[in-house]
């Protein structure tokens, strides 16, 4: 038996990703039915959900196609276990491995499809929370992002600002964790998501989200391209779906100019390097509005400007390098997404900010080639290496003026993302390793 369910509505777009569910199990029972729908939380792909009954491979169901930000209607399938695969209409995303979902008889479920990098996957959400008291709505939050780490969620008045001493409404949500249900008086709220225990590290701000009387809402937090920031999807039980896409990116500036030069840098309205920063110096990630943003730099009081093109949810490093009289500016995209939690691999790359290097850099880590042909003002790709307690770094160059660098020490942990910044001059390099996640 095969059922095909078509798209019936498209909801507002602004974020991505997933939420949790209860997965029932057991064999298929034709007398018990569950209601299921597909929600497409990808940025631009049209999706179809294919289900195959684990009890009877001849029993299948197809939901879709659903456009990005859209949903299918609820339709019935036999209760029991099903294998689920989400595919795109144009093969623009690679399906994750097939998932196994359980649908209980008389249950209602939302299968939320999401993307991460170039892949698409899905999670099963049980639409089964109890109704709140009159005048209230229920909110629960599910952190589906394996990239963003442990998160706190603050529910504030729409005009409020997040203070440093505030307590989270829902706290310490690790990847795959669903919060308890929290009742809220019906109305509009500002939601702020931060790194756990650190309100200054904002990962998403939703300026206004409205919950109506008797609403039962699940808010899913999902990964972005950079890894640290998140998007969100609000799913009202048996109701509408709205996506909230992050409107910001994270940017850090690295001053790799002549030694002891005073440097400032700002992007849009955000300060990247404050007054009195001395080169060489590596800044920290700062939130900047996405899109086209002016980059303003001063070196010893002399101004230089450029423009940054920032994707929402992205992480970027802006390198200011070369002679202070005519500094060059380049921006590179950073990938701070997590590696698989199994295994002992980590990601490592090199950023070359050497002044006056007439050649390129190459790096081996514990005799494994990590980077080659890294020109000045550029970053290598990420190389995967095995974690080590005291790794051996060997940095070489095609320019004889750089006599090489060899060092042992430190600790590189599995699933980490690291950048080696090579600053200074070939004769006096300044080498710093930064753990980006």
Region roles according to the model:
Residues 18-22:
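C-terminal motif of bacterial Sec signal peptides marking the signal peptidase cleavage site
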